[in-house]
């Protein structure tokens, strides 16, 4: 089975690879590993793999992985305002969907990026219509200070589980 990629180029390459596999009739599984991008994605540096990345207004938030470690960054390219390597990850499933979170700690602040999938309704054909949201939750001393949605849907890479230790789910 081909590996999953979050980039459009990766999806295109994956589809092309599946077409080629169908023509040949054999498949070779790929080893799961972090693949670095040749061009930086949002706030990820060259050689880092984006585990999460989205725009929030004029700024960006990203979690990037490299060599079994991950880093949270917030700001603008070339002007990062906050960096943290104190990260935890949580997942919670619920009827009709679930949520994945990565939380970065900095003193008494917690910055939680999340992606959530919910059942938004049923289509006329009986299909489940999924609603996807992603964003950033900011807490100080355990109290919500701000919540911001990403521009567009962003997902947390499944590869994050391999390098970010488990932590508590942050309700919001």
Predicted feature locations:
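C-terminal partner/receptor-binding element of secreted or periplasmic proteins
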Residues: 132-133, 138-172
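Charged, amphipathic alpha-helical segments
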Residues: 55-62, 87, 105-125
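N-terminal secretory signal peptides that target proteins for export/translocation
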Residues: 1-7
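Short, surface-exposed coil-to-beta transition loops
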Residues: 57-58, 97-99, 131-133
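Bacterial N-terminal signal peptides
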Residues: 12-22
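N-terminal secretory signal peptides
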Residues: 30-92, 101
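Short polybasic amphipathic segments
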Residues: 67-76, 129-140
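Bacterial Sec-dependent signal peptides at the C-terminal "C-region" and cleavage site
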Residues: 21-32
